[in-house]
């Protein structure tokens, strides 16, 4: 996702603020990263127990509040890709 100039660190802090709730909602892996080459770009990599767990997490009050707080700091440019995880280090079996 792309942030408006100067808001990357605020968005990263918001994204990292709900880790415990994500785990309880069925998130196995949640990684937030930034790019030195593109200072307004934030990457989020998530692995969920299922699509249903992810969809349910978006309905949680704390998730809705974080999204509402972040939206004014974002440009609206999002990309995403859904994968079927075959395995790897750090991925639950």
Where are these regions (language model features)?
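Short, low-order "capping/linker" segments at domain edges
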Residues: 83-93
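A short beta-turn/loop motif at secondary-structure boundaries
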Residues: 33-38
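An amphipathic, aromatic/His-enriched active-site/gating alpha helix that lines ligand/cofactor pockets
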Residues: 17-29, 47-81
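Residue-level signal for secondary-structure boundary sites
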Residues: 7-9, 52, 88
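Short glycine-/small-residue motifs
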Residues: 41
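Short, surface-exposed ligand-recognition loops at beta-strand->loop->(often short) alpha-helix junctions
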Residues: 2-12
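Short, histidine-centered active-site or binding-site loop motifs used for metal coordination
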Residues: 1-3, 48-49, 84
């Amino acid at each position: 996702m792309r942030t408006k100039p100067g808001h990357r660190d605020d968005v990263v802090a918001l994204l990292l603020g709900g880790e415990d709730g994500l785990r309880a909602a069925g998130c196995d892996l949640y990684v937030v990263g930034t790019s030195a080459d593109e200072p307004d770009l934030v990457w989020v990599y998530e692995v969920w127990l299922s699509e249903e767990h992810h969809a349910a997490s978006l309905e949680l009050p704390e998730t809705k509040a974080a999204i509402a707080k972040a939206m004014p700091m974002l440009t609206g440019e999002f990309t995403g890709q859904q994968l079927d995880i075959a395995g790897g280090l750090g991925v639950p079996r």
